[in-house]
């Protein structure tokens, strides 16, 4: 099986450009609609913030220097607003007022 490395890199960069819009201004990463617009009326979800932090860390390792800032943004949310500092673990989702559910990841 063969693949076109040029196409693969271009497609990866296209997907990363789409994902860059997911930065949530309150911390973490937002859900994106089909057009790539962040859905800021939805809470910041732990799984999305974890995934996007990982995606941008890989992008940074691939030489996309701009992605380092987004890794820092994600790690700050994971260590900050998504973390339950009183009992440990992470909240499944948070909005501007805090956790939207008592569901947590230990």
Where do the protein language model's features map onto the residues?
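Glycan-recognition and catalytic cores of secretory/periplasmic carbohydrate-active enzymes
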Residues: 1-106
């Amino acid at each position: 099986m063969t693949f076109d490395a040029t196409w693969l890199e271009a497609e990866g960069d296209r997907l990363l450009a789409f994902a860059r819009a997911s930065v949530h201004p309150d911390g973490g990463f937002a859900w994106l609609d089909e057009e790539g617009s962040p859905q800021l009326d939805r809470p910041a979800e732990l799984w999305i913030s974890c995934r996007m932090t990982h995606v941008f860390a890989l992008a940074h390792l691939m030489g996309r220097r701009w992605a380092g800032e987004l890794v820092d943004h994600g790690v700050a949310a994971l260590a900050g607003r998504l973390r339950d500092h009183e009992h440990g673990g992470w909240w499944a989702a948070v909005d501007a007022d805090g956790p939207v559910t008592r569901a947590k990841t230990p």
